[in-house]
């Protein structure tokens, strides 16, 4: 009976150690993954900002062209 308790205690102890090592590795992997996520988020926000600027510039140019076309049609100078 005593040897069975010792072996169960040993198994519990070894299982606890292996579990804690796995959790440490998982934590290290998650820390590395956070850096990649932040980099992806940063890249996405940069692309999003560039897209907004491009759309605003395109909208202004189209607006100017539209106004020029309308004024040309009204004054019949086209």
From Swiss-Prot:
Pfam families cross-referenced by the UniProt entry: Antimicrobial_2, FSAP_sig_propep
Residues excised as propeptide: 23-39
UniProt keyword Disulfide bond present: yes
Alphabetized UniProt keyword annotations: Amphibian defense peptide, Antibiotic, Antimicrobial, Cleavage on pair of basic residues, Disulfide bond, Secreted, Signal
Compartments in which it is found: Secreted
Residues annotated as signal peptide: 1-22
GO CC, any one term: extracellular region
Main subcellular location of this protein, as a coarse class: secreted
Disulfide bonds, paired cysteine numbers: 72-78
Statement: the UniProt record of this protein carries the keyword Phosphoprotein: no
Function: Antimicrobial peptide.
Family according to the record: Belongs to the frog skin active peptide (FSAP) family. Esculentin subfamily.
Name listed for the protein in its UniProt record: Esculentin-2Vb
